[in-house]
Each structure stands twice: as C-alpha cells, then as structure tokens.
Amino acid sequence: MREIVHLQTGQCGNQIGAAFWQTISGEHGLDGSGVYNGTSDLQLERMNVYFNEASGNKYVPRAVLVDLEPGTMDAVRAGPFGQLFRPDNFVFGQSGAGNNWAKGHYTEGAELVDQVLDVVRREAEACDCLQGFQITHSLGGGTGAGMGTLLISKIREEFPDRMMATFSVVPSPKVSDTVVEPYNATLSVHQLVENSDETFCIDNEALYEICMRTLKLSNPSYGDLNHLVSAVMSGVTTCLRFPGQLNSDLRKLAVNMVPFPRLHFFMVGFAPLTSRGAHSFRAVTVPELTQQMYDPKNMMAASDFRNGRYLTCSAIFRGKVSMKEVEDQMRNVQNKNSAYFVEWIPNNVQTALCSIPPRGLKMSSTFVGNSTSIQELFKRVGDQFTAMFRRKAFLHWYTGEGMDEMEFTEAESNMNDLVHEYQQYQDASISEGEEEYEEEQQLENEE
C-alpha cells in the first residue's frame, strides 16, 4: 500500500496535526487509544496508508511529532487522542527556538534533527511502498519554519524520489504573532520553493473570516480554526485513505496541479462549511457544493482568486455523488468563470470521487487550486520583509546564530522571482503560453 509518513513540527504544526489525527481517526472508526470499533470494511481497507497495525486490533499513526520545547507535546499527550501516538515518536528539545528561524534551522534545530531522522527512517522502513511525506508547520515561527524546512531538506536528500507535501500556515495580513514573522516566512518560502512538491497554504486570518462570516462564531478559538484545517487535510487525503473510482495520490495530484516545478503553492477550500457540533440540518446538493467551494470567501488563504487566474485546480467530492452531475457542475463553473482560468492549459480542472463522506455529512467537497493570485500573499510578506530588512531591524538575532545577511538577500530575491513568475503566467495569452508550455515539455522530455 502507498504509505505516507506524517511529521508535525513546532507549536502550530503539532496543534494542526493533532486535529488532523483526531479527524481521520474518527473517519476510520478508531477511538482515542487507537482501537478499531468501526462499522464498515471500507474504513479498514486502506487503514495502513496512515496507520501501522499493532497487536490487539490497535492502530498507531505513522506520525513523528517534533518540537524544540516540551510544552505543546505535553498538551498533545494530555489531549483526547494523546494515547494514540507511539511514545518513541515524540522528539523534543528543551530550549525552544524563540520564534527565531536561525535557531530552528541552524543551531537548536540542527542538534535535534538527527534524532528526528532516526524516527523518520524507522517509520519509512516499516512501509511496504512509501509514497511520500507530509508535514504540518507554520512559516512565521522558529521551530515549524526553521526546523521544519531543515527536516524537509534532509528528508529530500535521503528520499529524493518520494513526494513531499506540506501544509503550511502562512502569516496573515492583519493577525500577526511576532514582529519577525516576515523574516521567518521569507526564509521558509525560499526553502519550500526548492524542496517541497506541493504546499497547501493556509492562513489564520482567512480561517478567522470563515469562522466569523460563514460559521457565525463570535470569537473563534484556535480549536475552531484547527477544525477547519483538519477538514481540508482530511479532504485532500481522502483519495489516499479510501478506495474510490477516481483515485488520486500525492504524485497524481502534483502531476495534475503543478505546471512548472516552482509554482506549487495551492489555495484550499472546503464545502459545506458547518461549525463544530452543528451538523447541517439540510440536504446539500452538488450545485451548492460546487458553488460554495469556488466562493472566494471559502478559500483558506487570504488572496482572492478573482485577482489572478487558475493555472490548474482539483476538486475532490465525497459521499454518494453522481459522477455525471459532478462533471456537469464543474464544466458549468469553468464556463461561467472562464476568465479566471488560463486558456493555454485545456481541461485544467481535475475531479476525484470517493464514496465515503466525512463524519456527520452526507457529502462534501474539497478544493485545491493553483492560482496566480497566491502571489498576493508572497508580495505582502515581501513588502514587510523589505521594510524591516532595509533598516536591518532585528537582524542581530539571526546573525548571532551564525547566519549571513547574504542569505536574507537571496531569500528575498527568490521570493520576488516567484511573484514575477506567477505574474508572467497570469499575463501569458494562448499564443505565447503554448510556446512556453511546449518548450517546458520538450525540456522535460529531454531530461
């Protein structure tokens, strides 16, 4: 079976990761200690994509939990699903990275990284046919951003031909955790552009908006935000965990979604959005799902796709859905919004189906889009980065850990290049676009 090894690093990564495991354990009929008491064989059929089977009908997540301070790990351990994880897979330091990317990437994190890689290796060896890795982390802090990207590059070295998917929480425009967020995020994007195969961008502010606007929660907690993220993660990984007619795995998703290797930053959305505990009291139809799924208010990253164009996108429908209806609706959306799709990639919408809906819903859909408007997000961080870097504000925290200013300049220009690349393909018309696309294809064929 095509297994996936999951890593969660830093406070944010561990909290999102914990929510993810809670969600998929529920979908597979596992209780808080990993014992199976589900109702359907379908829950078991592909259990081993994410779980190892232990003795006594118990299943253990193939997860590695990493942090540079013990706090969040203790919270995960004390949580409702704390007994699920294998105790040896908790790897933590004592010192913390203090929101400093350099500490996570070069000093504190580098000391811990071999220990983590041992655990990763052990998990990878227990797999029949490892498909790839997924990592949850944030880009604004020290551990998730600095050490997370260090782990990604180390795993890349050791498993060059396996997929690397990241669920990355990007800094949001208005809600900021720390002053040095723009530094940490830019340095991280610099790494992700080179080392990740697919990055699902999530941002707290967009999640807040969804909670307040759509779910009518007056003051959403991180629990509510994480619940949304875990719904998307569960949706994106559905096809891997349940048999379906139109299955996709990480690699298929990447092949369909990434037209140029550097442009692999996706926006995600989920429908129907219901608040925790409030299962919907009305039937949802495929047209409604499609409608809500393509709604800009539904995107979990603060960039509006109407300011750019979709290179590619993918929709995953779950539940008892008629194949024909889905195709019709998707065609419908494309015709209605044809201005927002680039015309030089024909059939750039991919659909996958899975017959098992999430808990408490009859049907749902998950949306993954590769839109050029994601550049807004990088632009925003880039502007904040430039403002501080021009004055060399806060730099001593990084140079003190042995970093060089040159590295900052490199990261900045790499991110600016990324923005320009997105812009270039957004402006490309069918005549010039096809030539470039064909050139790319020729180059790839020659390789």
From Swiss-Prot:
User: GO CC annotations?
Assistant: cytoplasm; microtubule
* UniProt keywords, alphabetically: Cytoplasm, Cytoskeleton, GTP-binding, Magnesium, Metal-binding, Microtubule, Nucleotide-binding
Residues annotated as region Disordered? Answer: 427-447
Lineage top rank: taxon:
Eukaryota
Q: Where does GTP bind?
A: Q11, E69, S138, G142, T143, G144, N204, N226
Enumerate composition-biased segments (Acidic residues): 432-447
State if Ligase is listed as a keyword. no
- Role of this protein: Tubulin is the major constituent of microtubules, a cylinder consisting of laterally associated linear protofilaments composed of alpha- and beta-tubulin heterodimers. Microtubules grow by the addition of GTP-tubulin dimers to the microtubule end, where a stabilizing cap forms. Below the cap, tubulin dimers are in GDP-bound state, owing to GTPase activity of alpha-tubulin.
Recorded family membership = Belongs to the tubulin family.
Q: What is the official name of this protein in its record?
A: Tubulin beta-2 chain
Organism name: Erysiphe pisi
What is this protein's gene name? Answer: TUB2
